[in-house]
Amino acid sequence: RRLLRDLNIKINQVIPEGGSVKDLKNLPKAWFNLVPYREVGLMTAMYLEKKFGMPYVSTTPMGVVDMAECIQQIQRSVNTLAPTSSNKKVDYEPYIDEQTRFV
């Protein structure tokens, strides 16, 4: 959650944590899915991609290299799916640099 908060990304749902069957109807409202642990949620993310065309990021943001890769994948997803009317592209490279500079 902290990573998404730092990137100014609003979280739609955290499944299964605190989720209910009633909340499942909101899943397709997300621009993409983040699957931080492939053992939990990957099959659901694959289903949502197939059913709703919703991309997912499944790189675990643990360690310098994988955290940077995960953030870059998130950046690509957001920039691809952002409303075309905004013309604003996000650039998370400064955040990646800040998080990995002294490691």
Curated annotation (Swiss-Prot):
The reactions it catalyses are: chlorophyllide a + oxidized 2[4Fe-4S]-[ferredoxin] + 2 ADP + 2 phosphate = protochlorophyllide a + reduced 2[4Fe-4S]-[ferredoxin] + 2 ATP + 2 H2O
Can you provide one Gene Ontology molecular function annotated for this UniProt record?
metal ion binding
Enzyme Commission code: 1.3.7.7
Alphabetic keyword roster: 4Fe-4S, ATP-binding, Chlorophyll biosynthesis, Chloroplast, Iron, Iron-sulfur, Metal-binding, Nucleotide-binding, Oxidoreductase, Photosynthesis, Plastid
Family matches, as Pfam families? Oxidored_nitro (PF00148)
Q: In which pathway does it act?
A: Porphyrin-containing compound metabolism; chlorophyll biosynthesis (light-independent)
Q: Which GO terms describe its cellular component?
A: chloroplast
Segments traversing the membrane: none
Cellular localization per UniProt: Plastid, Chloroplast
The GO annotation for biological process reads: light-independent chlorophyll biosynthetic process; photosynthesis
Q: How is the cofactor bound?
A: Binds 1 [4Fe-4S] cluster per heterodimer. The cluster is bound at the heterodimer interface by residues from both subunits.
Report quaternary structure and partners. Answer: Protochlorophyllide reductase is composed of three subunits; ChlL, ChlN and ChlB. Forms a heterotetramer of two ChlB and two ChlN subunits.
Report the function annotation for this chain: Component of the dark-operative protochlorophyllide reductase (DPOR) that uses Mg-ATP and reduced ferredoxin to reduce ring D of protochlorophyllide (Pchlide) to form chlorophyllide a (Chlide). This reaction is light-independent. The NB-protein (ChlN-ChlB) is the catalytic component of the complex.
Q: What is this protein called?
A: Light-independent protochlorophyllide reductase subunit B
What is the phylogenetic placement of the source species in the record? Eukaryota, Viridiplantae, Streptophyta, Embryophyta, Tracheophyta
